């Protein structure tokens, strides 16, 4: 009987982030937004009606409008979006730290796709792939759709790798400690203590929460646990929670970040903003918060505005992910 050699017996870790256009031109942005906004997990609407609205109204307007915003934040030195740049570096650093695992990354929307990276990992000999969605707080619009895509890809494979998943880490001790330390380090750099630290999370239609999405609860717990870590050391700082990036006419989770910042201007408060729901800086942090919200805050008479960068590809982020993975699956040393 003919013998076949089998060299495949490796483990891999696949970091997954949201996604990005390939470039900041209208065509690239339109292609990315179409894939993103066509996901029924993201937009829960009548599919026929939504397809008409998306293709005839939203895509032509938003793609053109977003050229300037993407161009503003684009990493022109590497010709990549910040999200792609930081996620790629993060995976590379984690790969160097984990000798017994292949570490790679994918984007849920855009490139590199989950499908292409699962194929690549299999070609490298991976028979077990650990999926790590880089969303601390679970939502059907983020974490769930990652697994939807993973299993869609698996359904087409003759030889399916074993799949394991890392749990949402919104209340993980390593995550809470890392975010808390990040805030402390930022506060030390300031000339004066701010009146408020605002935790700004990406918003979600309230209807999704009413249907059972736990996202709000996860955001609130992250906020509460970090607040408990810091409030004794900073008794004169108010810690508050808000939600940004509202899209469409429906009611979203409140309070809205824009509204909270307007309140702070009227109260003559200085504010430090952190966006702990984002693993890497992106359009929502670098343009929406750092530029648009800050300009509006200052224009309306706000006192001082400071934004804490996301964890990005920092060593603290690498160590945090390493510890979370080790806690979940007991890494081979």
Curated annotation (Swiss-Prot):
Pfam families documented for this protein: Ferrochelatase
Coiled-coil stretches noted in the UniProt entry, renumbered to this chain: none
Binding site for Fe cation: 202, 284
One MF term in the entry's GO annotations: metal ion binding
Keywords, comma-separated and alphabetical: Cytoplasm, Heme biosynthesis, Iron, Lyase, Metal-binding, Porphyrin biosynthesis
Compartments where located: Cytoplasm
SUPFAM superfamilies referenced in this protein's UniProt entry, alphabetically: Chelatase
Main localization, broad class: cytoplasm
Pathway annotation from the record: Porphyrin-containing compound metabolism; protoheme biosynthesis; protoheme from protoporphyrin-IX: step 1/1
Any one biological process term the GO annotation gives: heme biosynthetic process
Functional summary from the UniProt entry: Catalyzes the ferrous insertion into protoporphyrin IX.
Similarity section: Belongs to the ferrochelatase family.
Protein name: Ferrochelatase
Upper lineage: Bacteria, Pseudomonadati, Pseudomonadota, Gammaproteobacteria, Thiotrichales
